[in-house]
């Protein structure tokens, strides 16, 4: 992949299962070295897209290139340049961690001497070198996921695909996995493409594409997406709420209401506004809180529903896709 060439380039990608269009003409580019996330509910088309980019599904239409290679015409070249961590575990529990990696190295034709050194590197990276001889079936869910990531890195891919890398894990283990993912980007000079339906995970990506019902409805950095949704929400507690409301209107041109026992209003750039509030309101403030727009707010602004609501409606969409596969 020449310097400056997109790590992933997608133009008009479509996937149909019978009469059901699971991916509907999406377009996007992933830059080398970035963490790029697909955020959306189950059934949005995220995994179907990854499966096409990894050559596991043939597109119905459109063009996709990964590491400079066409996913249809150059499937072998694509596969040599990618690592893939599936949503569902694919390790052999009756082999040791080292044996699982050795089998993977042989599949990719990694020379034995190079494979031994690379196994040490990736197992140390994910904190499993001391457990390399243990059977995988004795590992916790988080340890297995870390081993899956190590396996995906073994052949030094240009692009690592992670399909819901922390699904089913507890919050502490999810946080640990994300520490490894960020370290990978910094130490391996690799592009990371992941899918998730966890808002807090999408927040850590360099850029995210929000996907709903097979379409990309928004694509940008998390900060810019949230900034485009609306204003920050500020809540203040005072000894005289009505005086505070009048002062906000007169001195700042801000309309406020009393909600849930606090004076509540919306402003742009709330972090910069709060110091001005203390200096110029003229009414004593007991406490203040600031809430910025969330990615769930972004999702709702583009789709008219929360991601949780979309999860429920996506069940019906996935049933249609399943019928289309038959």
Which role fits each region the language model picked out?
Residues 231-306:
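Short, charged/small-residue-rich alpha-helical element at the C-terminal edge
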